[in-house]
Amino acid sequence: MMQVPGDVQIIKEDNVTHSFCGLACVGWMYQKIKDSFFLILGTHTCAHFLQNALGMMIFAKPRFGIALIEEGDLSKHEPTLEEIISEIKADHNPSVIFLLSSCTPEVMKVDFKGLANQLSTDEVPVLFVPASGLVYNFTQAEDSVLHALVPFCPVAPAGQKNVVFLGSVNDATADDLRAEAEALGIPVGGFLPESRFDKMPAIGPDTVLAPVQPYLSRVAVKLERERGARVLHSLFPFGPDGTRVFWEDLAREFGITVDLRDREKAAWDKIQKQTALLRGKKVFLTADTMMELPLARFLKNAGAEVVECSSAYINKKFHAHELEALQGVRVVEQPNFHRQLEDVTRIQPDLIITSLMTANPFAGHGFVVKWSMEFMLMPIHSWSGVIPLANLFVSPLQRRSKLPAFDKDVWIEGVMPSAE
């Protein structure tokens, strides 16, 4: 058990992380960096995973692909990818190619860094991104992508003070964050990542890095150490509570004092119906996306009873403010899933936020579930994301209230004649 400031205790258990493969990051990163191509060195399993997870047909020519490892490749010293790289350049004309690792070639001890350097040119760099599920939670693969981009961020001179938002968000959310910062008088240096490879932000000793995703601690530390940038330690901008604190703390970094309590109250007022439904509900968060801490904090402040908040990894410094806001909540790192099953059966929570792997079994036992993956894909940041965030939590509760109980005959009527 670990103690963090504010008398919050983190219970450390012994489980491997039940999570999507890190290759899933391709789904949002290739859409964000619009002149990129993501190449995965993997197996047929990787191909089936991406085909099903991303729902992209091959004739759509998406800006990602898989170089398949066959049985014959197991005896080779290193895979040969020159022809594939040439084909990618001819078909897609990318400005950068990300070479992602997967489990099998990592077990084979493929030298990915050497391979990427060999394939890289000045015109089209090939950047290695460790993304296999052997090491990282799937959202941390975005951290690895940003890690690879750091050398391509210009060095900002001393005295050039502005904010760089850290984390991939869609263009509409990026516009909202930029507009809000400028309205508060905060100079904006850009986003990491930007939508084009040649537009990555300049980062230097007077840059303030504002993480907007809670799973980017490694790249934040790298920029802090290598560029001398200052990392904003605050709540993440999810929900009225987190958004107010985030913007007030960020403004303070620039010597600007703002009081956004009225705006926070107005945001809570907009989701009164949702919070009324959440109030008093027992919510259980299993480890998956590493977004669990800020989501649990929002639920707690919305009046729900968070019976457990578990996460794959917790960084006591990077997540310090979120942990302080969770006083009184059971917080577990790398939870033992078998223990969680027993606790869920005993506690009978009203809502479980869980992974795609465990959602259907929980639903089959009569629990109301929400896929944690959905919080990754929806625009839930800052003031504009308050209503979408609240709706994500209440939609399964509203749906269940309109459905008959699982033991009613309506569920098998006309489906299995032998069961009638």
UniProtKB/Swiss-Prot annotation:
Leading EC class: oxidoreductase
Gene3D superfamilies to which the protein is assigned, alphabetical: Nitrogenase molybdenum iron protein domain (3.40.50.1980)
GO molecular function, one term: oxidoreductase activity, acting on the CH-CH group of donors, iron-sulfur protein as acceptor
EC nos: 1.3.7.7
Reactions catalysed, as given in the entry: chlorophyllide a + oxidized 2[4Fe-4S]-[ferredoxin] + 2 ADP + 2 phosphate = protochlorophyllide a + reduced 2[4Fe-4S]-[ferredoxin] + 2 ATP + 2 H2O
Cystines in this chain: none
Cofactor binding notes: Binds 1 [4Fe-4S] cluster per heterodimer. The cluster is bound at the heterodimer interface by residues from both subunits.
Gene Ontology terms: biological process: light-independent bacteriochlorophyll biosynthetic process; photosynthesis, dark reaction
Keyword Transmembrane applies: no
Subunit structure comment from the entry: Protochlorophyllide reductase is composed of three subunits; BchL, BchN and BchB. Forms a heterotetramer of two BchB and two BchN subunits.
Chain's role: Component of the dark-operative protochlorophyllide reductase (DPOR) that uses Mg-ATP and reduced ferredoxin to reduce ring D of protochlorophyllide (Pchlide) to form chlorophyllide a (Chlide). This reaction is light-independent. The NB-protein (BchN-BchB) is the catalytic component of the complex.
Protein name: Light-independent protochlorophyllide reductase subunit N
